[in-house]
Amino acid sequence: LELPPAVAEWGDVPGARRLDRVLFRCWLRLDPTLVGFLLSQIQQGELYTVHEIDRPGKAPRRIAEPDRVLKFVQRRILERVLEQMEIHPAAHGFVKGRSIFTNAEQHTQKAIVIALDARDFFPTITFKRVNGMFIKSGFAADTAGKLAGLCCFRGRLPQGAPTSPMISNLICRRLDGRLSGLLTKFGGTYTRYGDDMTFSGPEQILSLLPL
């Protein structure tokens, strides 16, 4: 099976909607019966183990870890769908070839460096937003709903699923573009590593931030 056009461009490819119908069986190589079963179990609140991790000075971080089969399916979606989609260059977290070090390198020798942490980052990304992201990327509505359903838990993006970091990068693409463009106008730089946003540049950038 040949690699289809980049998923982000499927909307401009003739017959893209027909390709969606065979996505699970031919491209992801997942049995539709298995997909239906997993979606049913997720809707019933199954297939995830939820626990909390204590953080000094912060609220505990809630982790929802998928079971072995669901995690396998999510990794397949990550590799064959999500990683074929384009994210913004300002995103450095969970991206091949980028790291916390490449993120920090963008802010060396700057007069002002400010780091902000987005509160409850993953839980604020809802099923509706994930579903919308897949639809805007060219998937038919029913396929987008199934993909979003396999990647969400209790209506939100779970921290602990292998698909969540890349989905968050794709969801934040517009935000990353707007903040990057704004900082550039003032001679500054913006990057994001997961839920950590960093702004740097001359003192003028202080007027842009709600500090």
Residue ranges and their predicted role:
Residues 1-51:
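Non-catalytic, polymerase-adjacent accessory regions of viral genome-replication enzymes
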Residues 46-48, 98-100, 182-186:
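Short amphipathic beta-strand starts and helix->beta connectors
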Residues 38-44, 93-96, 145-152:
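Short linear loop/turn motifs
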Residues 18-35, 79-81, 85, 125, ...:
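N-terminal low-complexity, intrinsically disordered segments
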Residues 17-22, 30, 61, 68-70, ...:
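Nucleotide/phosphate-binding site architecture used for ATP/NTP-dependent chemistry
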